[in-house]
């Protein structure tokens, strides 16, 4: 749920513009609720550069970074690789792929396997990986592949006392 959706829910109507993509809210907008509370809807802020490449990739996978400024084939290929690693069963089930036939394939080859299985071909029999990329990204964002977590919280250190401790 985005900020504008929350403002609309609390404000009791559709006062702030909402779309299923980032960057819709361009200016500040005050919304008054039915009980007189004023809420301020504002554009989001995204760091121009991330300390960790994985953070940027994960944001792009989810659509938090506009596809228009990205190479979607490269992005979808990386997503295929990540899904094959962290959610192999969901990935293979969605695209009807045999996991044993995918062992050792590059990220791009995994995207090609999706294109081939879905029958995405250009004239001359060349795989339409651009179309496959769009499908993989859309289906991941719509949770059609499954409800998959890209990041896990850091492991909590054990608070169990060790054998020599007096508790």
What is each of the regions a protein language model found here?
Residues 1-12, 42:
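Glycine-rich phosphate-binding P-loop
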Residues 14-167:
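Helix-rich effector regions associated with P-loop NTPase G domains
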């Amino acid at each position: 749920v985005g900020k504008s959706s929350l403002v609309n829910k609390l404000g009791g109507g559709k006062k702030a513009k909402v779309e299923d993509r980032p960057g819709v809210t361009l200016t500040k907008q005050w919304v008054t609720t039915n009980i007189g509370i004023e809420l301020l809807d504002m554009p989001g802020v995204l760091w121009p550069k991330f300390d960790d490449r994985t953070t940027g990739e994960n944001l792009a996978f989810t659509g938090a970074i506009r596809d228009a400024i990205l190479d979607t084939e490269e992005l979808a290929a990386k997503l295929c690789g990540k899904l094959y690693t962290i959610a192999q069963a969901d990935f293979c089930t969605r695209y009807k792929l045999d996991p044993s036939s995918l062992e050792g394939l590059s990220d791009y080859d995994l995207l090609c396997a999706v294109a081939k299985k879905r029958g995405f071909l250009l004239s001359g029999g060349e795989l339409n990986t651009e179309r496959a990329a769009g499908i993989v990204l859309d289906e991941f964002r719509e949770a059609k592949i499954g409800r998959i977590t890209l990041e896990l919280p850091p492991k909590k250190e054990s608070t169990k006392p060790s054998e020599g401790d007096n508790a």
